[in-house]
Amino acid sequence: TISKDPDMHGYNIKGIYGMNGSGKSGIVTSVKILKNILTDPGYLNNPIIQKNLDSIINKKTGKLFIESDFLAKYIDATVMCRYKLILSKNVTGKYSIEYEQLSTKKATSKSQNMKIIFEIVNGSIETLNIEDDKLLKDVIEKTRNLLTMESMSSLFYEKFLIPAVKENIIQNKKTMPNEMEKGIYIWLLFFFGGELHVFLDQSDDHREYVAINSLNEYSNGEKKLNPSIVRSLMRDKREYVDVVSVDQNIVSKHEYKDFEKTISKLAEFLRIFKADLKGIEIDKKENHDVWICDLVMNYETYNIHAEYESTGIKKLIQLFVYLREMVKGGIVFIDEFDSNLHDVYLCALLEYLAEYGEGQLCFTTHNVGPMDILKQYNKSIDFLSEDHKIYPWTKRGNYSPSKLYRNGMIEGNPFNIDSIDFIGVFGFDEEDE
């Protein structure tokens, strides 16, 4: 049962464990795709994205199915929403939206059935529940022939919310646009997508590899670079404008002061781990209407470009804004949270986020150290098996989840590998003696 004013503390942190290749990064990647489908109208029309999807989506089925339940508070009501999405290849070989559905109910109701807000099959609107007849007609008309490559929420944002907000600004209105009130559930879906923040470990973020291959296809020999590839790369780069990178941060001039404040806070954060850090300087170069910003670490007797910091410090630089979003109330997914981070630092961060974070954090890891922190909280540990099934940890008397996991006593995670299994693999066996 969900209360009228649910308190997420005690339920706001989750670690996903599993053997190598079990699909942990696949879960986080799916959330990244979900976010982009919900918020970016041009996502599926990006050729780089299409190549990436073709490489990562299940080869046997050729489909990606995502279902997500989320709670949303609107005025005095708490609403449970369920969103379903199926991506599949169309006749042209591109991934498109085969099926999309949003349904809702009062979160506090035990008996109420889910009400379908919209249902779309192969781009055709089967159901659309909007009480205002004019808005209903406009939505049908303005999304016609677009819903196979763009989601309802991203189109609603592009076709209705942006124009309505601009009109309100022109007329100096301070009330919510009518389109937001009349299409509130679609707006809540878009807002949910905006609250998702996903950090993929570099080895699992394949877009750069795909982009380089795509560029090579068009730049080899006498072929000219396809302009659509260039536009797609630029659009993909802008997606990360709010994320702090080690180098070449692209910052619009009107957002530069906010970027300075973020870097100042980043320096405070890093000083916890490196007490001799005096500050971080921004080396900026002008490029039309943006600044290209590198970070220079300032120590008492020398300066060093952030690129030459340790991998652990570089990881903390990248993670900073994601952790900040979780503290402020965002929903954050981090792949391989433990990579390049000391176990002591990781556990301290998790304790802080669980206690003071207003949002939610879900992360994948191989490090069993955090289990002793996580086991104190509800529904905080999931195990992913070799056959991709999820087994939630349930308390078993005084048993420690970390000990059971190490000993291969968690279902689907046998860890039945012994040192003798490596004999001969590296080119040395009994015959070579």
Name every feature range the model reports, one short phrase each:
Residues 1-33:
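Pre-Walker A-like glycine/lysine-rich segment at the N-terminus of P-loop NTPase domains
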Residues 84-272:
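Electropositive, glycine-dotted interaction segments
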